């Protein structure tokens, strides 16, 4: 018989956004005392795999009653191909998925049939899923955990101490044209001209730029 608890499926070690989509719920389950384990369904991802905080919960067995798939919705076909039908059978399957457009393509909607419900990270995503499927959809932003984080000063990154700072983060692997950092810079320059008296700064943080030097 399957155990009471939760299996989180996604990229537990992946140092990119979708990896956090699994890690934050995992840390919240740990704080709440809910039994859980994590399943790395695609360990050969090209993204860096150096976040080992959840290693002690890694498993290859779908032993719990509840599966939560913490992935981008575009990865649903790959998910089904790698895991097979048996992984979904006789379990309460939840998609905690990300999709940034107003509708899902039909080719992806067909892969929702194995799910019992969907969790959406934002109201926009919730509306999108409701337009795309009759499954129950719940708006559930990522949890905030009380884990201790390493603190850095502004001085370390040469950010003026008294400025109002805007932060934009993106991953080059997510396609620069889609993340559009140039538009962020233009919007900042438009809002705060060089003659402006406002003390403001724009900080852009990116990862994986070394793999996209032509961009």
Q: What are the functions of these language-model segments?
A:
Residues 7, 37, 94, 117, ...:
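A structural signal for isolated positions on well-ordered beta-strands in alpha/beta enzyme cores
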């Amino acid at each position: 018989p399957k155990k009471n608890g939760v299996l989180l499926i996604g990229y537990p070690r992946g140092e990119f956004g979708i990896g956090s989509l699994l890690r934050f719920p995992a840390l919240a389950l740990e704080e709440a005392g809910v039994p859980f384990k994590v399943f790395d369904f695609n360990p050969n991802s090209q993204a860096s795999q150096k976040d080992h905080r959840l290693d002690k919960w890694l498993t290859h067995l779908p032993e719990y009653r509840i599966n939560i798939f913490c992935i981008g919705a575009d990865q649903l076909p790959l998910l089904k191909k790698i895991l097979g039908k048996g992984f979904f059978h006789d379990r309460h399957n939840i998609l905690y998925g990300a999709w940034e457009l107003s509708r899902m393509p039909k080719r992806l909607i067909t892969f929702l049939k194995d799910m019992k419900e969907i969790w959406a990270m934002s109201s926009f995503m919730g509306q999108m899923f409701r337009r795309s499927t009759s499954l129950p959809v719940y708006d559930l932003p990522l949890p905030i955990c009380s884990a201790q984080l390493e603190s850095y000063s502004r001085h370390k990154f040469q950010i003026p101490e008294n400025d109002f700072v805007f932060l934009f983060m993106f991953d080059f692997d997510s396609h620069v044209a889609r993340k559009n950092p140039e538009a962020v810079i233009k919007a900042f320059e438009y809002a705060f001209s060089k003659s402006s008296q406002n003390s403001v700064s724009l900080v852009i943080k990116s990862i994986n730029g070394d793999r996209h030097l032509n961009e």
